[in-house]
């Protein structure tokens, strides 16, 4: 499988992250105790040269399955994890969760669930237009500075806010 390069930062230095050109989405790994299903799928994708897995805290047991699989295979150093946060919780689906505090919480929970100390890519799964872009980007940058995240992204944002975030990030 071919690779593409994503730029990131690690320990204050620019890095290049070589990601397979096909991302394995892990939304199907939502069930608890799903390693009988998830393990062979993850193994096959990895054997084909795939190395990047897309997951999210909101995907319930997906992060747990990927973390357990990496732990069983001892392959964390060969895996690229893209996870997402900032999604409303199921119990309060109408309450936005894109705040500096929720970003930190989601990354912390994801790292624990994935059994790792960092993710290569972290994206916000939603937006909260009631929160200014600046504090959101500052929170994301802090996670990069702290080494918990190497590159950041956005999902489901309106174009003007994406432009503002990009200008803030440059």
Feature-to-residue mapping (PLM):
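Glycine/proline-rich, positively charged
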Residues: 43, 47, 94-170
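N-terminal binding-site loop/beta-alpha segment at the start of enzyme catalytic domains
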Residues: 1-80
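Structural motif corresponding to the early beta-alpha repeats
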Residues: 73-101
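Short acidic capping loops at alpha-helix termini that bridge into adjacent secondary structure
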Residues: 20-21, 74-79, 83, 117-121, ...
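Generic hydrophobic/packing signal
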Residues: 70, 83-85, 89, 107, ...
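Active-site beta-loop-alpha junctions enriched in small/polar residues
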Residues: 27-29, 56-58, 84-88, 124-127, ...
């Amino acid at each position: 499988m071919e690779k593409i390069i994503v730029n990131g930062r690690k320990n204050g230095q620019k890095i290049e992250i070589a990601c397979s050109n096909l991302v394995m989405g892990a939304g199907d790994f939502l069930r608890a105790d799903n390693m009988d299903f998830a393990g062979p799928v993850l193994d096959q994708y990895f054997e084909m040269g795939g190395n990047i897995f897309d997951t999210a805290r909101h995907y319930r047991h997906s992060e747990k399955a990927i973390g357990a699989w990496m732990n069983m295979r001892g392959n964390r150093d060969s895996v690229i994890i893209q996870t997402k946060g900032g999604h409303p919780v199921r119990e309060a689906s109408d309450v936005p969760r894109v705040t500096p505090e929720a970003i930190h919480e989601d990354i912390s929970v994801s790292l624990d669930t994935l059994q790792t100390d960092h993710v290569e890519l972290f994206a916000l799964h939603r937006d909260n237009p009631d929160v200014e872009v600046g504090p959101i980007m500052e929170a994301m940058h802090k996670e990069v500075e702290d080494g918990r995240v190497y590159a950041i992204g956005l999902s489901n944002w309106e174009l003007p806010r994406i432009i503002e975030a990009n200008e803030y990030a440059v």
